[in-house]
């Protein structure tokens, strides 16, 4: 009985991890393909054209560096994994060790 409970618990959290990884991979692919945007709070330095008499600033578009974008998705994936592992360990302790 106990072994079956532990196996079910493991299967539940393994599936949740796989689902979270698939969601993160899909989001990464969508951002890379331009189907979705990754919104961050950013400030761009304005570039003033010397010939512009109206005083309108032309701001460069903010964009994450490729390495920063990869790091973001790696961090997101690791946070999801850590959270699922922690929740699984807590549930295991509650259901199996504290009975």
UniProtKB/Swiss-Prot annotation:
GO terms for biological process: defense response to bacterium; proteolysis; viral release from host cell by cytolysis. The keyword Hydrolase applies. Keywords: Antimicrobial, Bacteriolytic enzyme, Hydrolase, Protease. One of its GO terms (molecular function) is peptidase activity. Its EC number is 3.4.-.-. Pfam families: Phage_lysis. Encoded in the Rac prophage. This is Putative endopeptidase RzpR. It comes from Escherichia coli (strain K12). The lineage of its organism: Bacteria, Pseudomonadati, Pseudomonadota, Gammaproteobacteria, Enterobacterales.
